[in-house]
UniProtKB/Swiss-Prot annotation:
The keyword Protein biosynthesis does not apply. Keywords: Activator, Early protein, G1/S host cell cycle checkpoint dysregulation by virus, Host nucleus, Host-virus interaction, Inhibition of host innate immune response by virus, Inhibition of host interferon signaling pathway by virus, Inhibition of host STAT1 by virus, Interferon antiviral system evasion, Metal-binding, Modulation of host cell cycle by virus, Transcription, Transcription regulation, Viral immunoevasion, Zinc, Zinc-finger. A motif (LXCXE motif, interaction with host RB1) lies at residues 106-110. GO terms for biological process: regulation of DNA-templated transcription; symbiont-mediated perturbation of host cell cycle G1/S transition checkpoint; symbiont-mediated suppression of host innate immune response; symbiont-mediated suppression of host JAK-STAT cascade via inhibition of STAT1 activity; symbiont-mediated suppression of host type I interferon-mediated signaling pathway. Interacts with host UBE2I; this interaction interferes with polySUMOylation. Interacts with host RB1; this interaction induces the aberrant dissociation of RB1-E2F1 complex thereby disrupting the activity of RB1 and activating E2F1-regulated genes. Interacts with host ATF7; the interaction enhances ATF7-mediated viral transactivation activity which requires the zinc binding domains of both proteins. It comes from Canine adenovirus serotype 1 (strain RI261) (CAdV-1). This is Early E1A protein. One of its GO terms (cellular component) is host cell nucleus. Belongs to the adenoviridae E1A protein family.
């Protein structure tokens, strides 16, 4: 395997200009030229104003111009066309009585136990049972859900996001 090394270009601008000339698509009739000290703006590069919208762009080759004219013809024929779709069928109604939903499913998730009986939070050393409305870290009362109580028992003064939002709504945190 033979490797050839090309010398590094002396001027990056000249190198890019040469690459653009070598790789210029055939259907573009414009040439890259760096005239003046300021490069053309994006508006100048991409804002094409055609005198007649039906005439193909002078920058496109014959094949591209034909494809462009076919797309304009197809959109003109679709103007008066309306699509008739069937109406959406209504959702089936399910008869559910309130008696079929157990009451424990309607409780707030923050008050439901989130840990098993063997977990550290529900061990005999904890005094946390439910949501507390008073938050005073110096007194040592727990604030929030069982997960918050676990970290508060470890000495951290933190609560989870849901408990923070609930305390904020109740005006306990300012």
């Amino acid at each position: 395997m033979k490797l050839t090394l090309e010398p590094a270009p002396r001027c990056l601008h000249e190198y890019v200009s040469q690459l653009l000339e070598d790789w210029q698509p055939e259907c573009l009739s414009c040439e890259y030229s760096h005239g003046g000290s300021s490069p053309p703006s994006l508006h100048d590069l991409f804002d094409l104003e055609l005198e007649n919208s039906r005439s193909p762009s002078p920058l496109l080759c014959d094949w591209c111009a034909e494809a462009d004219s076919e797309s304009t013809i197809s959109t003109e024929t679709d103007v008066g066309f309306t699509l008739n779709t069937p109406p959406v069928s209504p959702l089936p109604s399910y008869s559910t009585s309130p008696a079929s939903i157990p009451e424990d499913m309607l409780l707030c998730l923050e008050e439901m136990p989130t840990f098993d009986d063997g977990d550290e939070v529900r061990s005999a050393t904890t005094s946390f049972e439910h949501w507390e409305n008073n938050f005073d870290p110096n007194v040592g009362s727990f604030f929030g859900c069982l997960r918050c109580a676990y970290y508060q028992e470890q000495g951290e003064n933190s609560i989870c996001g849901l408990c923070y939002l609930k305390a904020l709504a109740e005006g306990k945190i300012f």
